[in-house]
């Protein structure tokens, strides 16, 4: 084993070799993925970041290299020099990118040994995630994880290329900034110099990118880290990366057009997938009405239909009372519902109860009526109208929920997804984009007993709705837009407020006192008085976008060094306690 590499500089990566390299002498460097002995000849699957290639140690070709190869084990680090050749007839491996060739090794140098890893790097499953994260530097050697990280790099590079070719300027914004909570908790950083004060790590560059528009930079982008101290899920991290964009002198349509260009560029260059534009658009009200969610998966049908007007005077008490109490009745049509047994229908009832629904009615559509526990409570005309609105045909199953609008949409919106998975209605290879627009600008918080911003307080209201701000802020629609991909929000943004008087109206509607507004946002209000142009922007979650492009199950599989769902790093043992001396320097005390 050598402290220095004596074999000359690497000439190729393993995974980049093919039949066109046959006859060439190559120098490769990487790791032993798998070792096999066959009749005195040693075969090694040799790995680097670009993939695998089979290298061969034959005593007749190079006795010295063959003798040295007896020492090597899995994950040893090697440098080899040898000749590429086409594999013998019948020995081609079609499951391997480089399966048509192999490298006959003439010279071997063992650069380092390795202990036996705590898990198999060949396995794609059945490994405890905690073990993987504790030994993340080993987990990152696994081919699938490396492919994910390589695609992430490609997405970032293509993003920069796209924006720079469209006249955008990449500008960095501060990480140490002022705490202006935007919905989640801030990560706070104590100042040693200014004792008793704190910076906050940014939840987004929102204010700074708006100030860049005030500064005249016109088209800004940045691939930037953001931080939110919130409870984690499979697709959330305390620190995450977003593609951040802001533009001046534009409308919603301008931003949407550019962002559709970005998405089609990324999917074409990184996955060789093409899409037609423009993408479909739904208002928030349409999305909730048809899908029960503001992030609908439009790869399949099973849309919700409102039957409240038909069933408001129904003989079924639960329907009648829901309508009379300001609630609603909605249904989903399940084509070829004969696939659902009575037990399946009972299970669906249990499923919707998770979302607050008190029951789920069902009906099997026959040629001459229904088979249903509720059939006897309905008139023939009601059944006829329901069949017409649901476009029901013989063999379909209809499922109904009657409750408050929130419960109905939540339960049926989630049931729709559940059914699609159960009935295999989703094409996992399909990507379906949809824009959701005109969100409510504000929503009432039962916890805070006031209206709060649905997105953030700098979102511009729809001009026709400004009149509702003083007395009925819940009616105001936002000039906001989300891009949804396969049922997941991958980006969101809005047209911003560029006039101080409108921004002041928003703060008033949010119940914020002048003193609090000046303390948190005084510099922004001041900037709005110095010729702020109309502007707007958007941010895409890079982690989530790459997760969907790779088909990964968790966002942690597309981040090099992610945190756990408890926001810890098992590899470095962060967060950790610090010394009393460090705390004293910061004038802090643990209580």
UniProtKB/Swiss-Prot annotation:
Q: What is its EC number?
A: 6.1.1.23
Pfam families given for it?
GAD, tRNA-synt_2, tRNA_anti-codon
What is its EC class?
A: ligase
Binding of ATP, residues: 228-230, 237, 489, 541-544
Complexes and interactors:
Homodimer.
Which family is this protein grouped under?
Belongs to the class-II aminoacyl-tRNA synthetase family. Type 1 subfamily.
**Where does it reside?**
Cytoplasm
Which GO terms are recorded in the biological process aspect for this UniProt protein? aspartyl-tRNA aminoacylation
A single GO cellular-component term on record: cytoplasm
Species of origin = Syntrophus aciditrophicus (strain SB)
The UniProt function text for this chain reads: Aspartyl-tRNA synthetase with relaxed tRNA specificity since it is able to aspartylate not only its cognate tRNA(Asp) but also tRNA(Asn). Reaction proceeds in two steps: L-aspartate is first activated by ATP to form Asp-AMP and then transferred to the acceptor end of tRNA(Asp/Asn).
> Which PANTHER family does the record match to this protein?
ASPARTATE--TRNA LIGASE, MITOCHONDRIAL (PTHR22594:SF5), ASPARTYL/LYSYL-TRNA SYNTHETASE (PTHR22594)
Q: Which protein, by its recorded name, is this?
A: Aspartate--tRNA(Asp/Asn) ligase 2
Summarize where L-aspartate binds, as residue positions: 182, 228, 455, 496
Q: Which GO terms describe its molecular function?
A: aspartate-tRNA ligase activity; aspartate-tRNA(Asn) ligase activity; ATP binding; nucleic acid binding
Annotated positions for site Important for tRNA non-discrimination = 38, 90
In terms of InterPro entries, this protein maps to: Aa-tRNA-synt_II, aa-tRNA-synth_II, aa-tRNA-synth_II/BPL/LPL, Asp-tRNA-ligase_1, Asp-tRNA-ligase_1_N, Asp/Asn-tRNA-synth_IIb, AspRS_core, GAD-like_sf
Stretches for region Aspartate: 206-209
Q: Which reaction does it catalyse?
A: tRNA(Asx) + L-aspartate + ATP = L-aspartyl-tRNA(Asx) + AMP + diphosphate
Q: Which UniProt keywords apply?
A: Aminoacyl-tRNA synthetase, ATP-binding, Cytoplasm, Ligase, Nucleotide-binding, Protein biosynthesis
